Amino acid sequence: MAAQAPTEALKELQVGEAATTNGKEAPDGNAGRQRQRRLGGRGRCGPRCSPAVRVPLRRRRRRRRTRKKKKAPTAQSDPPRVLMSQLFPQKNYPVGEECEYLNENAYRTTDEEKRHLDNLNSDFLTDYREAAEIHRQVRQWAQKNIKPGQGLTEIAEGIEDGVRALTGHWGLEEGDALKGGMGFPTGLSINHCAAHYTPNLGNKMVLQQEDVMKVDFGVHVNGRIVDSAFTLAFEPKYDNLLTAVREATNAGVKEAGIDVRVGDIGGVIQEVMESYEVEIDGTTYPVKSIRNLNGHTIERWSIHGAKSVPIVKSNDTTKMEEGDVFAVETFGSTGNGYVRDDMEVSHYAKRGDSNVPLRLDSAKRLLNVINKNFGTLPFCRRYLDRLGQEKYLLGLNNLVSAGIVEAYPPLVDKKGSYTAQFEHTILIRPTVKEVISRGEDY
């Protein structure tokens, strides 16, 4: 129901309509309408109000629209694309599996001193734990999604895109891949091929139901590399082979520690590995340690350090030391237990100590690309293709011949055999050893 104006106020307003402006009478019938238009038309009380009744218009206060802040993601996407910095804004990355040393030498330092030494390595630990969490999240996705019928290129690129997305470094701008990303190319070695195989451009290989595939990839943050590997098989007949190698790796990890001789670790690994046998299609095979493959130390920016960890018993008296980072990896085989170079090369790495003059212009240009994008981190031909490099094979072979770049051919046992691999990165800290790459899967 519309409100009415008081009678006295109405009379005053009607008299006002006949008032003069500057002593002159306003034109009859027009002044009210013109004044009404100037004052904004009809009053707020609606069309039934008298034209002479004007109620001042109030400006509506505009409510400020506050944009709702997007909630930070709390879980990884599928495929993995959520940055680690979003999932862990305070950089409180999960700690790896911490294990007490079996043969702790109490005379070395007091517990307080060792804890102090651990605290000095905060950047070191943060980088390693971030890289390890990226590895866990990407491999978790890979284990769920890799299926027979997929091409090896699709599998490799899926893993590598996940790593790059989670580090936030896609490696397409000069120097970006040196800040974080792939620690080395994704190895997808099948059946009798034990290591160092990744598809080159145009590769048409497809994963088969009967295949046993080693998935070996590295993640680095600021040059600190986590190296970890697992084996996938889709037929239960290979279960004992995978169990033998996984348990051998765990035994090596358990034995590792400050002042432990690497030759002794090799003996423990071999004993566990070769206690297994596997029956495949009616034939029983002993599982053998591949005697010419080893674990190794990891240096900053370099996947292979100076020390090795054999996977068979040896007389090597080299000791693990505080501050070392080791990749403890084991390989088991139903074949000869010995590998040789074979097949097309895909893995390469620049040597850190090479300084040889080059004559070939293509080699000089390629070396410049390698220095600016990979440094001494391993790379593969697909990575050069991805950077837009073309017709580089002549220059690459020249760098290999000159000893500036090292080629890593695929390593194979005898045809018809099956090989498996499991690997962990461990930090030899002053107080404990930390199995940095440990996850719920292995």
UniProtKB/Swiss-Prot annotation:
It is an enzyme of class 3 (hydrolase). It is found in: Cytoplasm. A divalent metal cation 2 binds at D227, H296, E329, E423. Cotranslationally removes the N-terminal methionine from nascent proteins. The N-terminal methionine is often cleaved when the second residue in the primary sequence is small and uncharged (Met-Ala-, Cys, Gly, Pro, Ser, Thr, or Val). InterPro entries: Creatinase/aminopeptidase-like (IPR036005), Met_Aminopeptidase_Type2 (IPR050247), Pept_M24 (IPR000994), Pept_M24_MAP (IPR001714), Pept_M24A_MAP2 (IPR002468), Pept_M24A_MAP2_BS (IPR018349), WH-like_DNA-bd_sf (IPR036388), WH_DNA-bd_sf (IPR036390). A divalent metal cation 1 binds at D216, D227, E423. GO terms for molecular function: initiator methionyl aminopeptidase activity; metal ion binding; metalloaminopeptidase activity. Binds 2 divalent metal cations per subunit. Has a high-affinity and a low affinity metal-binding site. The true nature of the physiological cofactor is under debate. The enzyme is active with cobalt, zinc, manganese or divalent iron ions. Most likely, methionine aminopeptidases function as mononuclear Fe(2+)-metalloproteases under physiological conditions, and the catalytically relevant metal-binding site has been assigned to the histidine-containing high-affinity site. Its EC number is 3.4.11.18. It holds the Pfam family Peptidase_M24. It comes from the Eukaryota. Residues 1-81 are annotated as: Disordered. GO terms for biological process: proteolysis. Belongs to the peptidase M24A family. Methionine aminopeptidase eukaryotic type 2 subfamily. Transmembrane segments: none annotated. Substrate binds at H196, H304. It catalyses: Release of N-terminal amino acids, preferentially methionine, from peptides and arylamides. CDD domains: MetAP2 (cd01088). The lineage of its organism: Eukaryota, Fungi, Dikarya, Ascomycota, Pezizomycotina. GO terms for cellular component: cytoplasm. Keywords: Aminopeptidase, Cytoplasm, Hydrolase, Metal-binding, Protease. NCBIfam families: met_pdase_II. Residues 56-72 have a biased composition (Basic residues). Its cofactor is Co(2+); Zn(2+); Mn(2+); Fe(2+). This is Methionine aminopeptidase 2.
